[in-house]
């Protein structure tokens, strides 16, 4: 009877750890960081010899029982979304388990409550619209032109929701979003609701379709030798980029037939104080767009502002190339996010995402490629440069995390 009770307890412990790990991954944490938190929680809950196996889109836990049997627990996980508040709540649960405030009886309910937190879609829509407006101003659009990306982003988000509801494959959803944003942008300019060029709205919408959280987590997992997780995230990014290529090719081909006035590839440069201000506002809006509350909005503004100051100093003051400036700024962002995360309950990757999206995305480069494409000349150089910057951002942030870990002398398995 005693052996039976002990086995039941071990099974309960394994199920709790598996539930916690799956929750962290579904909320948007990298696999390596989720395993680090899960390992600490497992030890505190009484599982000393637990093995975590990376299987990409599923997580596997193996634990040896005293009778010599090895029990395996697996959970499917989604890697395509991020819920900042859910992630914060689950991180708090991990801290409470580590501090002994939660045990095997109380932890399951705490995990379930954390996983039940959902983001308000309408607030997320408002946050995305404000973020698109701020990015457009940083690209160089005037106030009336910047209204276009904000309105277009609403239609893009609605198209994404509809596609998700009727289970259209993501590749085609993204392609449809690319085409919808072009149609809406053209309609807004033709009706006079916003000022031209409408290509600014298209460029900003295309940039925001790139799943930047997946790029960050992909690099983190690759650095920590979790190849299957990194490959699964790479596939997610590739599907989104493939959709942009399909939809973008259709937009450019049709646009060449109907666009009489080719967009000017040069735009005005936003004054430095305004560039910094809208980076701050954009980061705060991005926090809202990703389900963040006031506890995230203000820190997001801080990291967005600091990242923008670094990037503007490098690009305007030192006239550094965009890719190099973005990479160096991303390293600083990773450092700041790690140290700030020590004071908050959000993972460093969440804070890094806020600052990156608001201050470092290569919106102007995408716009220049789009404007060049409408002239009949390939804009592939600009598109490849934009893709390079997106990858450099992920690598830079991951490097910042690694440097911060060395400074703090944290073990290699401990999450930043």
Q: What do these predicted regions represent?
A:
Residues 193-197, 255-269, 372-382:
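Membrane-interface helix termini and inter-helical loops of multi-pass transporters
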Residues 117-218, 287-290, 294:
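Core alpha-helical transmembrane segments of integral membrane proteins
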């Amino acid at each position: 009877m005693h052996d039976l009770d002990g086995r039941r307890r071990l099974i309960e412990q394994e199920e709790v750890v598996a539930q916690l790990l799956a929750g962290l991954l579904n909320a948007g944490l990298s696999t390596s960081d989720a395993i680090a938190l899960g390992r600490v929680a497992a030890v505190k809950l009484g599982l000393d010899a637990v093995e975590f196996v990376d299987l990409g889109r599923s997580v596997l836990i193996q634990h040896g029982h005293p009778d010599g049997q090895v029990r395996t627990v697996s959970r499917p996980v989604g890697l395509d979304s991020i819920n900042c508040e859910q992630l914060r709540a689950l991180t708090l649960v991990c801290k409470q388990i580590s501090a002994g405030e939660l045990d095997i009886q109380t932890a399951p309910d705490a995990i379930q409550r954390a996983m039940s937190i959902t983001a308000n879609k309408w607030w997320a829509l408002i946050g995305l619209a404000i973020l698109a407006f701020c990015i457009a101003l940083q690209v160089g659009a005037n106030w009336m032109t910047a209204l276009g990306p904000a309105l277009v982003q609403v239609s893009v988000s609605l198209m994404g929701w509809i596609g998700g509801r009727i289970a259209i494959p993501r590749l085609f959803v993204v392609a449809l979003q690319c085409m919808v944003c072009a149609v809406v942008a053209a309609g807004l300019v033709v009706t006079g609701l916003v000022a031209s060029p409408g290509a600014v709205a298209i460029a900003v919408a295309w940039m925001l379709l790139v799943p930047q959280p997946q790029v960050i987590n992909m690099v983190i997992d690759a650095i920590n030798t979790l190849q299957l997780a990194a490959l699964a995230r790479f596939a997610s990014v590739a599907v989104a980029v493939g959709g942009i290529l399909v939809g973008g090719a259709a937009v450019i081909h049709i646009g060449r037939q109907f666009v009489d006035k080719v967009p000017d590839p040069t735009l005005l440069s936003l004054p430095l104080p305004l560039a910094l201000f809208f980076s701050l506002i954009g980061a705060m809006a991005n926090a809202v767009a990703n389900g963040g509350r006031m506890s995230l909005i203000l820190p997001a503004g801080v990291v967005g502002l600091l990242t923008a100051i670094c990037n503007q100093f490098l690009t305007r003051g030192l006239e550094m190339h965009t890719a190099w400036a973005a990479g160096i700024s991303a390293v600083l962002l990773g450092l700041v996010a790690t140290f700030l995360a020590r004071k908050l309950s959000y993972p460093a990757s969440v804070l890094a995402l806020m600052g990156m999206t608001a201050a470092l995305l290569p919106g102007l480069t995408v716009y220049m490629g789009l404007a060049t494409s409408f002239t009949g000349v390939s804009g592939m150089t600009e598109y490849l440069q934009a893709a390079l910057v997106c990858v450099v951002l992920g690598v830079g942030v991951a490097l910042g995390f690694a440097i911060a870990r060395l400074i703090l002398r944290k073990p290699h398995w401990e999450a930043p």
